[in-house]
């Protein structure tokens, strides 16, 4: 064991490339859970289940299992918010190893579709998040280059990406002293879908200046590489900052990875073009025989345009619809996915498996029904049906040794688990929330009173309702009563959702209202009360699993309480309350046995993914939170002095034309006045939100 500069112990294991930064040794049920899981893997168990309650340190247990086995790992999460949270935590545990993030790179995605009843064709439209695309490329690069890799992904990883072998064959490796013609390098870069751009040098581009070629690798976010040639020989290579041009350090060898997962060698493109032509002829014959002349003309026109593009530049819009021809697969064969990039001995962790497994099963059919219309009406060739996510049985066939992770395992995990490892006792000694049942007839007034108690002591509240309308009405009611409240709903995108959760932790507002978004894995230690309205309405949102998950959101606070508003106690409520009670008793017994006094969880408030979510705004929010704490500690005279200082600073900055500094001083002044006088001094969005 060694230590970092910050004093964090670093643990290594024999034969493992991982260096686990271990701020604290395993405690509670963790040591036994880690031992059993590693033993199960060594014994060759295909499936295991880690039944871990909220706040028991499941992620830390997973990190320990990965470090001890020394194998690459894929961690599946049910949504981007949870994936981002896991990525952030694994980065802290393995800062010296490769921790990667692989989620859908679409900020917006409108798939290609045809509505026969209205004769309406909807073109594919999408907006790609450049930074997430870079992280996806970095993930596949790491899997090819090294073994100490942890990939955190959503279930979008079961959608087809480029063939691993074709991708690997396109890699360009250069060493100092290699004989390489400048034109050959430029051609290889173009084949890898790098764009030559002398003016705007950004990720996935290159520029040529005499004997110097600058390449901005597609999988890098910050560094580019300069290749210096002399007489068709690589004379030197240096990393540099693409923004400032500052040279960083020399390199003796560098590997350029393709700018897209869908790159293919020229020979493969030509082979695919011939296969597409054959399929097109068959399809035209089919439509003609069935007297569908419009469809025959449509498929010919659309496909010939794509063929021309493929022949000339090796790429076309919607190239993924021809993926079967590029990979040489037969009709109906499973597409290549991220899982194919994993080595055979990799580990798979399926986090919140009771949700994730269901998602995997549901992906294929929705995709299939949309594409069948496109094929039937001549917008796409039948091979487009093979550009699809994995079917559930195919996913099962691709699964490596797998550990399901959930506080509420579903039927699939229970049927397939070789062993179930319980992790119920928390190292912090925190006890599961106290569950209180109160009548639904007075739920809103009672909730308002309970919220007031929590706000008075600086704690946060989550409220879950059954319908969108009720969430909106409740949010308006609470806001009218002076409560700082926000509403989390399905229309809010991933980035904004993460920011809302961060703002709740920072104290920008005190109450978060939602429907089905306040469940799995949301890590908010400041929340002391979870209120479940209409808890006696049986259904998906009020099932035993849903109730246990929602109650668990208050399990990270020392005063955690869950209030279920119901006029009758349903069977789901009974089972959820009984299971929570069982876990409370086990934790209390553990605390007594080991002399543990429960202590709250303290967790740094920070941006979840640097670069994906604006780090600048995160720093601003952190500074604001620190200022609020300082303002709270001031007496009246100190507050008056601080207000005068800020007013003077604001006026001086404005006089010197330093408008950004003046605006920052103005915002600090508004915050201080709001804190002291209890009223908002300005309204940025017109609705009281900032």
UniProtKB/Swiss-Prot annotation:
| Pfam families, sorted | Helicase_C (PF00271), ResIII (PF04851), UVR (PF02151), UvrB (PF12344), UvrB_inter (PF17757)
Annotated localization: Cytoplasm
State the Gene Ontology BP annotations.
Answer: nucleotide-excision repair; SOS response
- Please give the chief subcellular localization of this protein: cytoplasm
CDD domains found in the cross-reference section: DEXHc_UvrB (cd17916), SF2_C_UvrB (cd18790)
Q: Where is the Helicase C-terminal domain?
A: 443-596
Q: Which residues bind ATP?
A: 52-59
The entry's cellular-component GO terms read:
cytoplasm; excinuclease repair complex
Q: Which PROSITE patterns match?
A: HELICASE_ATP_BIND_1, HELICASE_CTER, UVR
Residues annotated as domain UVR:
640-675
Q: Where is this motif: Beta-hairpin?
A: 105-128
Domain Helicase ATP-binding residue range list: 39-422
Q: What biological function has been recorded for the protein in this entry?
A: The UvrABC repair system catalyzes the recognition and processing of DNA lesions. A damage recognition complex composed of 2 UvrA and 2 UvrB subunits scans DNA for abnormalities. Upon binding of the UvrA(2)B(2) complex to a putative damaged site, the DNA wraps around one UvrB monomer. DNA wrap is dependent on ATP binding by UvrB and probably causes local melting of the DNA helix, facilitating insertion of UvrB beta-hairpin between the DNA strands. Then UvrB probes one DNA strand for the presence of a lesion.
Binding partners and assembly? Forms a heterotetramer with UvrA during the search for lesions. Interacts with UvrC in an incision complex.
Q: What is known of its domains?
A: The beta-hairpin motif is involved in DNA binding.
The protein's matches in PANTHER family, at most eight in alphabetical order, are given as: UVRABC SYSTEM PROTEIN B (PTHR24029:SF0)
Write the protein's name. UvrABC system protein B
Q: Which gene encodes it?
A: uvrB
């Amino acid at each position: 064991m060694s230590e970092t500069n910050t004093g964090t112990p670093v643990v290594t294991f024999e034969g493992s490339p991982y260096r686990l930064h271990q701020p604290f040794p395993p405690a509670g049920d963790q040591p036994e859970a880690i031992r059993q899981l590693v033993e199960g893997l060594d014994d060759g168990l295909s499936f295991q289940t880690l039944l871990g309650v909220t706040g028991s340190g499941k992620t830390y247990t997973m990190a320990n299992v990965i470090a001890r086995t020394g194998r690459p790992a894929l961690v599946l999460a049910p949504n981007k918010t949870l994936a981002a949270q896991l990525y952030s935590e694994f980065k802290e545990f393995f800062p010296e190893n490769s921790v990667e993030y692989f989620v859908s790179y679409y900020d917006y995605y409108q798939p290609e579709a045809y509505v026969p009843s209205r004769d309406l064709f909807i073109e594919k439209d999408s907006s790609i998040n450049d930074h997430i695309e870079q992280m996806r490329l970095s993930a596949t690069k790491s899997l090819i280059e090294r073994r100490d890799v942890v990939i955190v992904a959503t279930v979008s990883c079961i959608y087809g990406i480029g063939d691993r072998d074709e991708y690997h064959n396109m890699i360009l490796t250069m060493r100092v002293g290699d004989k390489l013609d400048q034109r050959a390098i430029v051609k290889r870069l173009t084949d890898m879908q790098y764009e030559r751009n002398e003016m705007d040098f950004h990720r996935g581009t290159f520029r040529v200046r005499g004997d110097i070629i600058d390449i901005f690798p597609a999988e890098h976010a910050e560094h580019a590489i300069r290749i210096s040639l002399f007489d068709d020989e690589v004379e030197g290579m240096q990393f540099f900052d693409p923004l400032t041009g500052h040279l960083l350090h020399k390199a003796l060898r560098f590997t350029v990875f393709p700018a897209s997962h869908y790159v293919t060698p020229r020979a493969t493109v030509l082979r695919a073009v011939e296969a597409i032509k054959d399929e097109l002829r068959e399809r035209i014959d089919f439509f003609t025989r069935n007297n569908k002349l419009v469809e025959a003309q449509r498929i010919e026109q659309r496909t010939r345009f794509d063929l021309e593009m493929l022949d000339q530049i090796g790429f076309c819009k919607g190239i993924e619809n021809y993926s079967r021809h590029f990979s040489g697969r037969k009709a109906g064969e499973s597409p290549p996915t991220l899982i194919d990039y994993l080595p055979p001995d990799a580990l798979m962790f399926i986090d919140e498996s009771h949700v994730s497994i269901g998602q995997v099963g549901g992906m294929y059919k929705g995709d299939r029904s949309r594409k069948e219309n496109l094929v039937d009406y001549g917008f796409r060739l039948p091979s487009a049906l093979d550009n699809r996510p994995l079917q559930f049985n195919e996913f099962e066939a691709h699964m490596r040794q797998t550990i399901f992770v959930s506080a509420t395992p579903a039927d699939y995990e229970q049927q397939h688990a070789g062993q179930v490892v319980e992790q119920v006792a928390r190292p912090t000694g925190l006890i599961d929330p106290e569950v209180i049942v109160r009548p639904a007839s007075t739920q809103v007034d009672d909730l308002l009173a309970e919220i007031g108690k929590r706000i008075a002591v600086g704690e946060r509240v989550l409220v879950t309702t059954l319908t969108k309308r009720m969430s909106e009405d409740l949010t308006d009611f609470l806001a009218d009563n002076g409560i700082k409240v926000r509403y989390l709903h399905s229309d809010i995108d991933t980035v904004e959702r993460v920011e809302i959760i961060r703002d709740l932790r920072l104290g920008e507002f005190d109450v978060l209202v939602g429907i089905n978004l306040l469940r799995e894995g949301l890590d908010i230690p400041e929340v002391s009360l979870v209120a479940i309205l209409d808890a006696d309405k049986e259904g998906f949102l009020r099932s035993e699993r849903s109730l246990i998950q929602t109650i668990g959101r208050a399990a990270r606070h020392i005063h955690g309480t869950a209030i279920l508003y119901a006029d009758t106690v349903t069977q789901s409520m009974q089972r959820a309350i009984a299971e929570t009670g069982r876990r409370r008793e086990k934790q209390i017994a553990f605390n007594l046995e080991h002399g543990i006094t429960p202590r709250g969880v303290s967790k740094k408030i920070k941006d979840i993914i640097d670069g994906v979510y604006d780090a600048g705004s995160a720093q601003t929010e952190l500074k604001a939170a620190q200022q609020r704490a300082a303002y709270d500690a001031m007496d009246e005279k100190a507050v008056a002095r601080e207000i005068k200082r800020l007013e003077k600073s604001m006026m001086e900055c404005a006089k010197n034309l330093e408008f950004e500094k003046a605006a920052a001083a103005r915002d600090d002044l508004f915050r201080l006045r709001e804190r002291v006088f209890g009223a908002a001094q300005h309204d940025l969005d017109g609705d009281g939100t900032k």
